[in-house]
Swiss-Prot record:
Entry keyword annotation includes Transcription: no
Keywords: Repressor, Ribonucleoprotein, Ribosomal protein, RNA-binding, rRNA-binding, Translation regulation, tRNA-binding
Gene3D superfamilies, sorted: 3.30.190.20, 3.40.50.790
Presence of keyword tRNA-binding: yes
The protein's name in its UniProt record: Large ribosomal subunit protein uL1
SUPFAM superfamilies: Ribosomal protein L1
Cited function: Binds directly to 23S rRNA. The L1 stalk is quite mobile in the ribosome, and is involved in E site tRNA release. Protein L1 is also a translational repressor protein, it controls the translation of the L11 operon by binding to its mRNA.
Annotated family: Belongs to the universal ribosomal protein uL1 family.
Molecular function GO labels: rRNA binding; structural constituent of ribosome; tRNA binding
Assembly mode: Part of the 50S ribosomal subunit.
Pfam families in UniProt: Ribosomal_L1
GO terms for cellular component: cytosolic large ribosomal subunit
Domain of life: Bacteria
Length: 231
């Protein structure tokens, strides 16, 4: 316990409370503070000026990070026929139809992303109570229900991340690992920010990008000066 306290004390000393840092400096501080014995993820949160209680202000989508996520993504695809072969060639880990649904009902969910062709949704829809709570339910808004399953598989494997506002209007997402170069994390950050800015609801009023923070799995959060990001 003493080691944890000492580590946290060192981390806190490197970040000034209530100070807003330029995004480049924030990323550098987070990398420096990521001293755990594993490769910590680097995460970002965007506090947006939206009312998530209103359906027309819920932001949801996906974006392929140019430098990837630093993790291996296992992809399952519900499809059949030529689409099944295309999905396999694109790198899907599991491809099936009724047989895949049976495996999932049996508790076999060894994958991170589920993709489905439109014709498969009659089967996938029956798995809502299993896939939904795990955030695995395919959705056309994030590109996981699509006739072009091969492209969706390639995107997932290339480092696609999904984002969605929570009840407080905050988007949480991972932009890489602490082992990434600062420039690579910044490039991923910019790609995610660009997607979120483009997704701004027409009904959203006032300041859209209210607060931004960057953190690592075991480190402290660093608040970002929103004027330092290109929005």
């Amino acid at each position: 316990m003493a080691k944890v306290s000492k580590r946290l004390k060192v981390l806190r000393s490197s970040v000034e409370a209530n100070k807003l840092y330029a995004i480049d400096e924030a990323i550098a501080l987070v990398k420096k503070a990521a001293t755990a014995k594993f490769d910590e993820s680097v995460d970002v949160s965007f506090n947006l000026g939206v009312d998530s209680r209103k359906s027309d202000q819920v932001i949801r989508g996906s974006v392929v990070l140019p430098k990837g996520t630093g993790k291996t993504t296992r992809v399952a695809v519900f499809t059949q026929g030529v689409n099944a072969e295309a999905a396999k060639e694109a790198g899907a880990d599991v491809v099936g139809f009724e047989d895949l649904a049976a495996e999932i009902k049996a508790g076999n969910l060894n994958f991170d992303v589920v993709i489905a062709s439109p014709d498969a949704m009659r089967i996938v829809g029956q798995l809502g109570t299993i896939l939904g709570p795990r955030g695995l339910m395919p959705n056309p808004k994030i590109g996981t229900v699509t006739p072009n399953v091969a492209e969706a598989v390639k995107n997932a494997k290339a480092g696609q991340v999904q984002y969605r506002t929570d009840k407080a209007g905050i988007v949480h997402a991972t932009i890489g690992r602490a082992s990434f170069a600062e420039a690579d994390l910044k490039e991923n950050f910019d790609a995610l920010l660009d997607a979120i800015v483009k997704a701004k609801p027409a009904a959203a009023k006032g300041q859209y990008l209210k607060k931004v923070a960057v953190s690592s799995t075991m480190g402290l959060g660093v608040r970002v000066d929103t004027s330092s990001v290109n929005n």
